[in-house]
Amino acid sequence: MNKRNIENTRNALLQAAEKLMTEYDDPSKITARMLTKEAGVNLAMINYCFGSRESLLFEVFDKLQAEAMNSSPAFRKILEDDTSPKEKLVEIYFHSMKLMLDNYNLVRSVTKYVLMNRELSAKRGSLKFIQAHFKERKTESECRLIAYELASLHELAVLRHEEIKNVCGIDLKNDDELRYYIRKHIDMYLD
């Protein structure tokens, strides 16, 4: 298969996954057969192009999340103003977690996949703010690990938000409590 055909197949699968993810509340119900039928491609092409169904769904979710966050004027304003890197991280995680909590059925299975399969070397949007905060007091590797740990911690909290509410009394669906939770963890990592 030539490079152009692979790219066309990849794009068809991404479009099919995006369409199905907006139609279904639970991505775990979206089968590989449904995806390839919608895309009009061979079943084996999901693994060939993405490695797995979950990886395909994650790529679509990541794109949708970035579009949603970038379309928020309040979020864009925070990233562009002179707020400290630490405060920008609070807002990044606040908007990201809020979006995930508001779309919990959509993100549940994708987030489980991400937690178990994301590579430590994966580019994290928070990395540049962590590096700016530490101003060379920590190496890039140390900052990358902090970005990975913060992202994983917050993604796990989204998955376990009901138990966190029941056991710890912190309602992550409440904006003030969500900000408190995020700020507490960022303060622990960004000493």
Which residues fall in each region the model found?
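Basic, helix-initiating cap at the start of DNA-binding domains
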Residues: 1-25, 29, 34-38, 55
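An amphipathic alpha-helix adjacent to DNA-recognition modules
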Residues: 10-15, 28, 49-73
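Amphipathic alpha-helical interaction segments
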Residues: 12, 34, 55, 91, ...
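Short hydrophobic/aromatic patch on the recognition helix
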Residues: 39-50
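Amphipathic alpha-helical packing segments from all-alpha helical-bundle domains
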Residues: 69-73, 111-145, 176, 180
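Hydrophobic alpha-helical connector segments
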Residues: 73-106, 140, 147
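Amphipathic alpha-helical segments used for helix-helix packing
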Residues: 94-118, 161-163
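C-terminal peripheral helix-coil segments that are non-catalytic and often amphipathic
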Residues: 131-140, 153, 157-191
